[in-house]
Design a protein with these regions (language model features):
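N-terminal signal peptide
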Residues: 10-22
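Soluble metallo-hydrolase cores and metallopeptidase-like ectodomains found primarily
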Residues: 25, 105-109, 114-138, 191-270, ...
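Noncatalytic luminal/extracellular "stalk/propeptide" segments of secretory-pathway proteins
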Residues: 31, 35, 47-145, 150-152
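Alpha-helical metal-binding/catalytic segments enriched in His/Glu/Asp
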Residues: 75, 241, 257-315, 437
Length: 450
């Protein structure tokens, strides 16, 4: 119980409030997670989910079994309103034994992962290597396989290469090989969604995209064969998971923290987004536990957590939930998600990517200042990439995505690869993410107004 004594000694701190934020409450919550009874509980919670069920591809039994398992655990935890809501007509794509082979100037089976959603197709053609996206407008790609060998500038900047199928198909291209979206590789191609299911398309490992680039620069003729056996199947129904801590005064106003439970069909889906799930669960568990002995932690508004399905397929699960609830009696007061690595922030390059008005941003800044006082370095940065909660953000609901400093590059070493395993996380990563999400939920569920 040393942590309790330490907290009592700190009650004399001159920094009990930071604007509208009660720093003593933030300190109590964050220390309970980082140094108290909740330490490492999120990581421990995550282990059976990813080890026992593995990756959780949409429309697969592993996902639906993991949903059932998670719901039962949440009920045992005593949360309010634990239930699932169906998300029908979800895209159902099955990866096959796909191959891409360099035929000229030598024979080499290339290391690829088919881009999600692509239908079966075979094509053999000459390839043209482009180092920049804009070159599609000045290069003859008609009848050719387009190979992109771009330099890494960032995921959101480079995602256009993986999604180029529709545009290059309109120019006559017959196939797409996109350099994987990441700054580092050990022969590890990345998967992800594309833009046209009818054009054979795959992601190349960084090493082999650069190999093809070197061959092209030496004026070698490249001939490549693509054989896609993956296929689209009839749509399925999946489920979002919802659980609450009911508000004591304004239960119809909802503060949302969220992550997604589905993953691609590779690795364990621990990084993307099992860690986010664990952090959200840990934040909710801590607020509930503290509220049982300290009335300050009984939220006035309802704190809701959602584990989304079908995030990897265009946020389809979240979009369906939004459509079902947008005209309901509940009012979403604040929305958030963590889906870019549940890592410990080490510098103020770690951000809360924020959408909202000037007044709301100022209040978010006060929350950040309180986190900093509790040794959690972070800053607020405006940004319109809000993932699963984008629909609410577009409606004007203030929103946040947590992105740790390691989320900009290190996260993409493993993102959408076979290397997405639990051992990526280090001690404290999920705890710190939970402390951030828990602070947001606690403070905003109790403030008077924006």
């Amino acid at each position: 119980m040393d942590w309790i004594l330490h907290l009592i000694l700190l009650l004399g701190s001159p920094y009990l409030t930071v604007g509208f934020v009660n720093n003593d409450e933030v300190q109590t919550l964050t220390r309970y997670i980082l140094r108290g009874p909740s330490r490492n509980s999120g990581l421990e919670w995550l282990e059976p989910l990813v080890d026992d069920f593995g990756h959780r591809m949409l429309c697969r039994k592993s996902l639906e079994d993991a949903i059932d398992f998670t719901v039962e655990r949440l009920r045992q935890d005593g949360f309010d309103n634990v239930h699932t809501e169906e998300a029908p007509n979800m895209p159902n794509w099955e990866r096959g034994e796909d191959t891409v082979t360099l035929l000229e100037p030598r024979n080499l089976k290339l290391n690829i992962l088919t881009i999600g959603g692509v239908d079966p197709a075979k094509v053999t053609a000459e390839a043209v290597v482009l180092e920049d996206y804009d070159l599609i407008n000045t290069t003859n790609v008609n009848g050719k396989i387009v190979v992109f060998n771009q330099k890494w500038t960032g995921y959101y900047e480079d995602i256009k290469y993986r999604r180029a199928a529709k545009e290059i198909k309109a120019l006559g291209a017959v196939g797409l090989l996109a350099k994987s979206l990441g700054p580092f590789s050990i022969g590890s191609p990345h998967t992800g969604g594309g833009s046209d299911e009818h054009l054979p398309a795959a992601s190349l490992s960084l090493e082999e995209a650069e190999l093809l680039g070197r061959l092209a620069r030496r004026n070698k003729t490249l001939k490549i064969s693509i054989d896609i056996r993956s296929k689209n199947l009839p749509p399925c129904t999946s489920r979002n998971i919802i659980f609450d801590i009911k508000g004591s005064e304004k239960p119809e106003e909802v503060v949302l923290i969220s992550a997604h439970i589905d993953s691609w069909d590779l690795g364990q889906g621990a990084l993307d987004d099992g860690g986010g799930m664990a952090a959200v669960w840990q934040a909710m568990k801590v607020i509930r536990e503290l509220g049982q002995t300290d009335k300050r932690f009984l939220p006035k508004r309802t704190i809701r957590a959602i584990f989304w399905t079908a995030e990897e397929h265009g946020f389809a699960g979240a979009k369906h939930y939004y459509e079902q609830h947008k005209n309901g009696k509940e009012k979403f007061y604040f929305v958030s998600e963590t889906d870019q690595g549940a890592f410990k922030p080490t510098t103020t390059k770690s951000i809360l990517r924020f959408m909202g008005n000037t007044t709301q941003r100022a209040k978010m800044q006060e929350i950040v200042q309180s986190l900093k006082r509790n040794d959690i370095p972070i800053s607020v940065q405006e940004g319109d990439k809000q993932g699963d909660v984008q629909s609410w953000a577009d409606d004007g609901v203030p929103s946040v995505q947590y992105v740790a400093d390691k989320g900009a590059d290190f996260y993409f070493y493993f993102h959408h690869t076979t290397g997405d395993y639990l051992n990526i996380f280090e001690d404290g990563d999920i705890d710190y993410t939970a402390a951030i999400m828990g602070t947001l939920a606690h403070v905003l569920s109790n403030q008077d107004k924006w």
